[in-house]
């Protein structure tokens, strides 16, 4: 019933919201925009001239506008200029301009004078602050360009843009186009910066930045590149510039299309709700995802910066050059950029093994996709709230995983040719999913349309079971059954069939692929030998080995071992396999040399310890953790040497967290606290690739004195984003109830940026010792949280964090709370959080009795 009720509500919203799309009566071809921001007054003045084409004669034109105060408006057509009356529709964020005499079909020009606010909600044209200075910056995606200038704020309405900014003397201006001129005036104490006309692009890609910026310059194959920051962080921009230079070259070559927007500016912003934003020619970033300390940064931080930058630069082709027609195809933007991001990084730094990160990221999608409330990749959306919700693991990581799977089957060269042809065909235009897979099918000659459509239009994760029937002539006949994986284990409840390739690999490294397109079918694979059912971990499906296996001989590579761990985890999570099978597998991988595998085990075993192990069985479980993983850490050594290889530090860090949190290892906890104390005095005393974990595990037994030292340290780190967030994120790890409450209250302080409040609370909801207190705090402080964050930034993350609760009573509490405090931008998120909580309670009930018996024997 709940599923039906939710669907009914969602359909009602969508139907009621159809009017929020603009009427198809006019379309813009060019905007000339002039802005005069008042940083001290947190307002701006604007003037714009919009060239439009009218589809038919009309007396009115409707466009988007929100939080805009209109001044005089005129419309000129066929040589006649008329003053327009403005009628606002605040609910739908539209303005209708009406003139006395009908405008003829064809060309017309609108001129608008208006004012707006530089808001504090990190959307549209907004205010950011740092070092006593103010900055005016933008974040337009998805539907907030209308807060900066009246416009056709839908992706299908592409136009060119001329931008001018009149700003305070001494400030810098950045926009999408290259700077053409910078002249004094015309007002006292001001100067006007004029930018080159852009190619045709959607409104959500417009960028405006004003303030005291310092930039580092370079170029790549004729494209000027700058990485810009507040002046105090300029020394942290070198790594991003180096990465961008390589990535532009890589993408020029891969796509066979030269970078399409002339120049590229990359700007770090102190207050920024997204991770980064692909504005054409002017990419904006959250500072911690762009700046790298050349003297002291972890490989993980550098890899993250390079990967996020690669994602945004890929968007200059996927999303900016070719843009989806409507937001239901956002996967054409985000999924493709996610798929591409690792390619450029892998070519530049093969030693980073980013294919492991890509495989690990797929789990974010699977975590969402195993829910019965999961959405298909392509989902009908209408309102800004619904649009906001589809920027999720399904759009990003699931799409990327699907593309990797199909690419592996078709072959990288053929797939690349199809991509290049698609981008060339739709350059500076809009495209749909049908446009993409039709072109890919035409170029490759492979049934990509059948595969992609099957995977894009259905929710859920396929799970395959295998039964080897016979071996004839060195070829195995394998009966393969596909069904939709469900956390409740009932795979017959939602019968579905996908069309996708499954690739099997034997121990000699040879793979054979078959298209799976029926509920049950027999496939042939050579030779007759044990095989791993997801070669190189490239398939977007789960493998249910029957009988269940707890050995790793079938998985030959790191990626395959990671895939095996996660496959077996989901079998245990749904009670399809006894949970002790996963524990046996974990024991077999304790000495694995891949940090990501140990980190995955740490996360999965942490779930078991905090949600499935009975309180009375905690000592036995902790002892098993210590007995299994303690010798591994002892062999690696703790604290180890700061100069140890990154992989060694990564394994040590994962084991330290596992033993400290799930194993209750008193010696590890003591050493971690000593290391944290030493790190405060001398950061060089701890390896940079395990510093975050040292501070976190050190906090577990930390007292008021250590907490105060963490807080004091934060105040000194304004110019070191990576180090700042090491300490900031560690605050939630203090188990002392009084210190936990202090951290929760700190989240609402003015000194904590609004972009960080939601992240802190979401992270604390993930910690078993903090989740109940954090949920109580969220309920008690809901008005203050929504006032600080708004409903588009921060709140969705908090809602997703609630899925870490684990009792039916908590599920009922969450449902009741959001029935009274509805958040339209997180409707699906609330439903998914409730389902996650209920599924956690279910697996606890199903697995805990057998686990208790197993622990008593181990």
What are these regions (language model features)?
Residues 46, 137-143, 150-310, 339-342, ...:
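Hydrophobic helix-coil surface modules that form long, contiguous segments used
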Residues 362-363, 475, 490-492, 506-507, ...:
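Long, ordered, helix-rich scaffold segments
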Residues 45-65:
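Ligand-binding face of N-terminal immunoglobulin V-set domains in extracellular IgSF glycoproteins
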Residues 70, 80, 195, 224-483, ...:
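Hydrophobic alpha-helical and helix-loop surface patches within well-folded domains
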Residues 18-45, 78-80, 130-135, 155, ...:
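N-terminal, polar/Ser/Thr-rich
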Residues 58-82, 497-499, 503-505:
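Solvent-exposed beta-hairpin/edge-strand motifs
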């Amino acid at each position: 019933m709940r599923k039906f009720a939710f669907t009914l509500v969602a359909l009602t919203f969508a139907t009621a919201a159809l009017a929020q799309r603009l009427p198809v009566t006019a379309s813009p071809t060019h905007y000339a925009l002039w802005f005069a921001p008042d940083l001290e007054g947190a307002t701006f003045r604007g003037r714009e001239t919009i060239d439009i084409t009218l589809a038919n004669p009309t007396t009115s034109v409707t466009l988007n506008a929100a939080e805009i105060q209109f001044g005089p408006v005129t419309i000129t057509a066929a040589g006649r200029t008329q003053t327009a009356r403005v009628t606002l529709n605040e609910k739908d964020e539209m303005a209708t301009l009406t003139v006395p005499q009908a405008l003829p079909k064809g060309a017309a020009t609108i001129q608008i004078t208006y004012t707006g606010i530089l808001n504090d909600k990190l959307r549209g044209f907004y205010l950011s602050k740092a070092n006593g200075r103010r900055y005016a910056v933008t974040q337009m995606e998805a539907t907030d360009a209308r807060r900066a200038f009246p416009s056709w704020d839908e992706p299908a309405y592409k136009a060119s843009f001329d931008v001018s900014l009149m700003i305070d003397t001494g400030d810098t201006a950045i926009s999408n186009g290259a700077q053409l001129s910078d002249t004094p005036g015309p007002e006292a104490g001001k100067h006007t910066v004029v930018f080159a006309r852009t190619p045709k692009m959607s409104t959500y890609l417009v960028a405006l930045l004003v303030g005291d910026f310092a930039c580092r310059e370079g170029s790549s194959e004729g494209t000027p590149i700058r990485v810009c920051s507040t002046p105090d962080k300029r020394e942290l921009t070198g790594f991003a510039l180096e990465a961008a230079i390589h990535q532009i070259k890589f993408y020029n070559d891969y796509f066979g299309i030269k970078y399409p927007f002339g120049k590229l500016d990359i700007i770090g912003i102190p207050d920024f709700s997204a991770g980064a934003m692909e504005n054409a020619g002017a990419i904006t970033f959250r500072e911690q995802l762009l700046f790298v300390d050349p003297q002291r940064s972890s490989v993980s931080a550098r890899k993250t910066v390079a990967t996020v930058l690669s994602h945004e630069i890929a968007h200059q082709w996927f999303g900016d050059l070719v843009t989806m027609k409507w937001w239901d195809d956002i996967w054409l933007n985000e999924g493709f950029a996610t798929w591409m991001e690792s390619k450029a990084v892998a070519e530049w730094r093969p030693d980073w093994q980013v294919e492991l990160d890509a495989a690990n990221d797929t789990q974010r999608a699977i975590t969402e996709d195993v829910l019965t409330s999961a959405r298909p990749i392509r989902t009908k959306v209408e309102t800004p709230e619904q649009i906001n919700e589809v920027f999720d693991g399904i759009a990003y990581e699931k799409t990327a995983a699907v593309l990797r799977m199909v690419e592996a089957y078709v072959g990288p060269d053929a797939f690349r040719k199809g991509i290049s042809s698609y981008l060339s065909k739709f350059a500076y235009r809009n495209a749909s999913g049908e446009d993409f897979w039709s072109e890919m099918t035409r170029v490759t000659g492979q049934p990509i349309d059948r595969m992609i459509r099957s995977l894009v239009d259905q929710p859920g994760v396929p799970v395959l079971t295998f039964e080897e029937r016979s071996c004839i002539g060195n070829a195995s006949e394998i009966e393969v059954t596909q069904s939709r994986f469900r956390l409740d284990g009932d795979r017959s409840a939602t019968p579905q069939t996908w069309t996708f390739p499954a690739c099997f690999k034997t121990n000699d490294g040879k793979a054979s692929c078959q298209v799976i397109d029926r509920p049950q079918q027999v496939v042939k694979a050579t030779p007759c030998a044990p095989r791993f059912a997801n070669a190189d971990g490239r398939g977007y499906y789960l493998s249910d080995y029957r009988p269940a296996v707890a050995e790793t001989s079938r998985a030959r590579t790191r990626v395959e071992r990671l895939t095996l761990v996660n496959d077996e985890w989901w079998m245990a999570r749904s009670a399809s396999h006894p949970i002790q099978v996963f524990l046996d597998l974990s024991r077999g991988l304790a000495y694995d040399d891949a940090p990501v595998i140990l980190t995955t085990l740490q996360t999965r075993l942490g779930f078991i310890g905090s949600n499935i192990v009975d309180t009375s069985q905690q000592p036995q479980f902790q002892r098993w953790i210590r007995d299994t993983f303690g010798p591994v850490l002892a062999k690696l050594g703790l604290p180890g040497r700061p100069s140890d290889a990154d992989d060694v530090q990564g394994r040590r860090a994962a084991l330290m967290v596992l033993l400290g949190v799930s194993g209750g290892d008193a010696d590890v906890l003591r050493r971690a606290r000593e290391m944290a104390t030493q790190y405060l005095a001398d950061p060089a005393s701890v390896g940079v690739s395990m510093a975050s974990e040292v501070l976190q595990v050190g906090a577990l037994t930390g007292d008021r004195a250590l907490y105060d030292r963490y807080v004091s340290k934060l105040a000194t780190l304004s110019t070191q984003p990576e180090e700042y967030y090491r300490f900031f994120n560690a605050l939630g790890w203090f188990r002392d109830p009084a210190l936990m409450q202090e951290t929760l209250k700190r989240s609402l302080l003015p000194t904590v940026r609004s972009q960080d409040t939601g992240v802190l609370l979401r992270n604390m909801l993930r910690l078993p010792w903090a989740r109940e207190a954090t949920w109580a705090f969220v309920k008690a402080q809901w008005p203050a949280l929504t006032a600080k964050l708004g409903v588009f930034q921060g709140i969705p993350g908090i809602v997703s964090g609630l899925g870490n609760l684990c009792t039916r009573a908590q599920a009922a509490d969450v449902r009741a709370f959001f029935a009274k405090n509805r958040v339209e931008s997180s409707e699906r998120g609330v439903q998914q959080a409730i389902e996650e909580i209920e599924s956690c309670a279910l697996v606890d009930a199903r697995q805990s009795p057998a686990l208790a018996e197993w622990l008593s024997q181990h």
